[in-house]
Design a protein with these regions (language model features):
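Feature recognizes metal-dependent phosphohydrolase scaffolds
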Residues: 1-108
Length: 108
């Protein structure tokens, strides 16, 4: 539940797969990954923080576009665009048009 630069082989692959598919929140106290929370942001307990809310100076000036958290739907901040609108649950399929800064959604 923490990044370790010494990971290799299967543990390295497993950690990265978990980050890209399961990471939604981190524990506020120690920034450890929490893999159980999957609800909307307004249901987030105080001890958890959305992964994208932690300040990361290395990402300053970049915008992160992500999905795989349909419970938060379209969510935009200066630094992130969340696009998962739950197409597999009957919601919409959404995409971000970089050229026009638009989010386009079509029904499932």
């Amino acid at each position: 539940d923490y990044y370790n630069p010494e990971l290799e082989g299967m543990p390295y692959l497993r950690f990265n797969l978990n980050v890209f598919t399961r990471m939604r929140a981190l524990y506020r106290a120690n920034k450890a990954l929490n893999f159980t929370f999957k609800k909307p942001l307004d249901s987030l307990p105080f001890y958890l923080v959305p992964w994208f809310a932690f300040e990361n100076p290395g990402l300053k000036g970049y915008q992160i576009v992500f999905g795989h958290w349909s419970a938060i739907g379209i969510t935009r901040t200066d630094q992130v665009i969340a696009l998962d609108t739950g197409v597999v649950w009957g919601g919409a399929l959404s995409a971000y048009a970089v050229e026009t800064d638009e989010i386009i959604s079509v029904p499932a």
